[in-house]
């Protein structure tokens, strides 16, 4: 399990992991109210990337990362559906 200290390193590695095999990759968000920490984990069952934070400003970064991944998912699906219908 690779735990990253900086958001930039984590987001690059997580996007690369997703693009390597989109069908196996999954993202998990976990919030612990008791200590106010947020943990995001991206895994494909072989590699596990983790980023933990307790900073409120990182929530915006995580939200932006999620929307970026969703765009990648939708773009990939729309291309494959278009190829199937042709």
Curated annotation (Swiss-Prot):
Lineage summary: Eukaryota, Metazoa, Chordata, Craniata, Vertebrata
A matching Pfam family: SRP9-21
Keywords assigned: Cytoplasm, Ribonucleoprotein, RNA-binding, Signal recognition particle
Subunit structure, as described in the record: Heterodimer with SRP14; binds RNA as heterodimer. Component of a signal recognition particle complex that consists of a 7SL RNA molecule of 300 nucleotides and six protein subunits: SRP72, SRP68, SRP54, SRP19, SRP14 and SRP9.
Compartments where found: Cytoplasm
Disulfide bonds: none
GO biological process entries: negative regulation of translational elongation; SRP-dependent cotranslational protein targeting to membrane
Amino-acid biosynthesis is among the record's keywords: no
Family note: Belongs to the SRP9 family.
GO MF terms, alphabetically ordered: 7S RNA binding
Protein name (database record): Signal recognition particle 9 kDa protein
Main localization, broad class: cytoplasm
Function of the protein: Component of the signal recognition particle (SRP) complex, a ribonucleoprotein complex that mediates the cotranslational targeting of secretory and membrane proteins to the endoplasmic reticulum (ER). SRP9 together with SRP14 and the Alu portion of the SRP RNA, constitutes the elongation arrest domain of SRP. The complex of SRP9 and SRP14 is required for SRP RNA binding.
GO cellular component: cytosol; signal recognition particle, endoplasmic reticulum targeting
InterPro entries reported for this sequence: Signal_recog_particle_SRP9/14, SRP9, SRP9-like, SRP9_dom
Keyword Ribonucleoprotein found: yes
